[in-house]
């Protein structure tokens, strides 16, 4: 029970910090609950992409995929928010599946844990691309982790 309370408190703190860091205030003033809902949506999207892209790659494998999304959000060549990075055409093919939509609405606990860990301390701040069949023809190869090849 204590662990669930700690996890809840940590997720609220992370949501508040993410809200503060995001551009959510740029359009119109938001209440904390509206901001928290927006950030929880991002957490669920990150958990879903981690599950569907790397759910069989262990915690670090999922974290590398989450890092890819977070690094893209900060990179000027990509959209500046989690939703648009994940749904950008021809990037994460899993978004077109029913399984992805299920993962968004019912995220796995281990995937949420991976997101929260990644938001607390990012495992890698360089990765922008990954591929399951070898290094892509674009970007600079960085490393292979289990079945995925990561590049910047």
Predicted regions and their residues:
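N-terminal secretory targeting signals
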Residues: 1-41, 152
